[in-house]
């Protein structure tokens, strides 16, 4: 595991974007595993800037996102498709036919999860998987649990997640109660993993993930067993590390 120390969020985003551009330059038709959330926003902005300058070409690049809410159509502004389209895809020259996100509108969970696993397998697997880190150590929607869920599956969102999300919806009944997510095994099959972490509030969980016991109670701790992980964390995220 390589740990790169960044000064702040902007520096983290720039360093992460460097790792992703190196991948795209070395293998233009690579498969990028992508994430949503606040952590990768700056990384996407940096990649867009370099694309606009003519330094990057995504015309052959393919992508597979980690997760999507079940029950939200693509045009709902809370869907992960909407996030990816508006924060990244529409600004670069990636072919939308080469982008993949679980289909939140497929009601049959078993069918959708099997389809998505096959999509990734047919792509030849993910070359570089970008991950953010949840406050409880989750990656994708793989929450702390008694066991690692291996493949793409449907998760029931916790009451606290539903409660936290309700501000984005008209009523609590509109808040999605489930999501589709790549499993821990799906994530671990990526050839390379890039974990980006910013902010003091994630410092303790980052330390546990990188140096604590490997346990499904801290899903990101499984990354210790992957042989090609790059972590880019800012000083705040490293601030509670002992020593
Ligand atoms: C997003 C995802 C989540 C986030 C995590 C961190 O697709 O799968 O695991 O990466 O919740 O979120 P932020 O970056 O918003 O702190």
Question: Residues of each region from the PLM?
Answer:
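N-terminal active-site beta-alpha-beta segment that forms phosphate/nucleotide-binding
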Residues: 2-115, 119-122
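Conserved phosphate- and dinucleotide-binding cores of soluble alpha/beta proteins
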Residues: 4, 72-78, 82-86, 90-243
